[in-house]
Amino acid sequence: VSNKKTEPLMEKIEKHLLLCDNEATSLQYEILAEQLPSMNQRIKDAYKNTREFVNFIHEVLPEAKINFVSKELAAQDFTPSVFSLDLPTKGSTDEERESYKRALNLKLIHLMITEIPNESKFCVSYGQLKGCYWTIPATSTQGTTKEGDKDYIVRASLSGNMDLEKHKEVFLEFVEGYM
């Protein structure tokens, strides 16, 4: 399965799968066949929630740096549900600013998890069916990366099935309490 932009890669992907004996099992194909019909809608819904949440963060915390897909790419159907958030920091030295930012990241994540425990999780998974996952890549997915190259930012992955208004409310509480 591919879109028009990835069609030229399909032959190379097939070759890789054959060489590495890494093709999906029959059970995996069955699961994919079951889930595929609703997958496109779930992707659209997750992107919609993520775009709305990112726009909200821009409104209430404009000095934050957010890495998220551009509207131009999204118009070409590249619609992820993951964004990175680099919170504004304080301090006189680089060390103070970095230390403050790391503590602030954890405060945000813990507040979201504490206030919305049924939907917000401290996790590295993406593409979930429900809720919102939060992580700091430097402490999870970048375990073998050199310390100086690690990203001490917040990364969030939203689904299409979550209480977006509650997440906005708690984020605003964070901004008003800590920023």
Can you name each region flagged by the protein language model?
Residues V1-K150, S159-D163, G177:
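Active-site C-terminal subdomain of aminotransferase-like
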